[in-house]
Every structure is written in structure tokens, then in C-alpha cells.
Amino acid sequence: MTIANWPACERPREKLMESGAAALSDAELLAILLRVGAAGKSAVDLARELLHRFGSLTALFAAEGRALTSVRGMGETKYAQLQAIPELARRALAESLRLPTGFDGPAAVRNYLRLTLAPLPHEVFLCLFLDPRNRMVASEEMFRGTLTRTAVYPREVARQALVHNAAGIIVAHNHPRGTTAPSQSDIRLTHELARTLDLIDVRLLDHFIVAGQEIRSLADCCDRLPGL
């Protein structure tokens, strides 16, 4: 039975219009995006198959094109649609960090960092450069490493802070396939960054570690960081 033949209260689009997006399951929301399924399976069936195969929304949105288009009912158009969703979310969150009021808490920053770093298979060191009102003026990937290691140079971070005339910086890196537990080298790097930035009167506000959907603030274990 196609979705068009379902009772109106069970159709994802009608259900969303009636009760709001929060009332829908992951598969139902994904089905609205996919629009159609394939011969013998509805868009909801296809959405459930994708979630089962990839295990989570995060893994699905991070999947390579070849893996996605190998699923019957998926093609380049649907792959492009799936790629657009997290990118739009990242851009919307980045916009919110540039609002005149700046950010009034860590939630938006954490969400932005999750969306940016969680899907990556390699380690990346990211810097958010802030103006005196805590508005983000730039987000830059400063260093990129292998699965387990990235070389970070505090002087390069300080140089970019001067380029952006930043008053403060938030840094973050991911632990692909790891945990958010900071290593001793993570803590040493944080102290070294804070000392280097102090020399040019720039505050290091926080250092976050992202692993999957988990995120940890090093302000909790580093007394040099004021936190957000």
C-alpha cells in the first residue's frame, strides 16, 4: 500500500502539519525528505531501511555517496538532498553565533561543533574566533590529522586570531572512534594555547572534545579556561 492510501492521520506530511515535526519518528521525517520510495516500498519503508542499514541519522548523513546509492530507491538526487540537510543546519547554527547578541550559553556552540566534527573520519582541530561581544567572526579548520593524531601549533592559532582581530577563541577537536576523555597531551595543549593567546590579549574561552554525539568541555578540568 502506498502512503497516499494510508489514513490521513498516519501520513507523515499530514501528521507534521497537524501535530508538528516533533511528533514524527526519524523514519517519518526522513520519508518527507525522500518523498518517494521504490517499486514495492514506500518512502517510509525506504527511510526505515536506511536507518537500519546505517544505524543512526548521524551515520546516514555522513555516509559516502557510493554506500547510499547502492540502496534500491536511492540515487544521486536523494543523496544530494541528504547532504544538504546537515550543511543547512550547520549554516543556520553558524548564523545564530553571529547574531548581534552573540551566544548566551554553550548549547548553540555545542550543537554547531557536533554537526561539524562528529561525522568526520579523521581528526580535525577547529577554531571559532569571537569578537568582544562573543559573536563568531570566523570558523576555521586549522589543522587536520589522521584517525588518531593531529599536530597543533599555538603560534598559528595566535596568528589567525590577529588576522580576525579576535577578542576570544573557542577551540575544538574530534576523537574519531574514541571517547571525549581528554588525554594528557590535550590538557597540555590547552594550557599552552592559553599562555600563547594571553601574550596577545586574546582569551581562550574553552576547548571542546567531540566523539560521536558526545561532547566535553575542558573548562571543567582546566582552571585557565573561563568557560562559556
Curated annotation (Swiss-Prot):
Record GO terms (molecular function): metal ion binding; metallopeptidase activity
Keyword Metal-binding: yes
GO biological process: proteolysis
InterPro entries, A to Z: MPN (IPR037518), RadC_JAB (IPR025657), RuvA_2-like (IPR010994), UPF0758 (IPR001405), UPF0758_N (IPR046778)
Keywords in alphabetical order: Hydrolase, Metal-binding, Metalloprotease, Protease, Zinc
Gene3D superfamilies: 5' to 3' exonuclease, C-terminal subdomain, Cytidine Deaminase, domain 2
Boundaries of every MPN domain copy: 102-224
Amino-acid positions noted as binding Zn(2+) in the UniProt annotation, renumbered to this chain: 173, 175, 186
Motif range (JAMM motif): 173-186
Family: Belongs to the UPF0758 family.
UniProt-recorded name of the protein: UPF0758 protein H16_A3033
Lineage: Bacteria, Pseudomonadati, Pseudomonadota, Betaproteobacteria, Burkholderiales
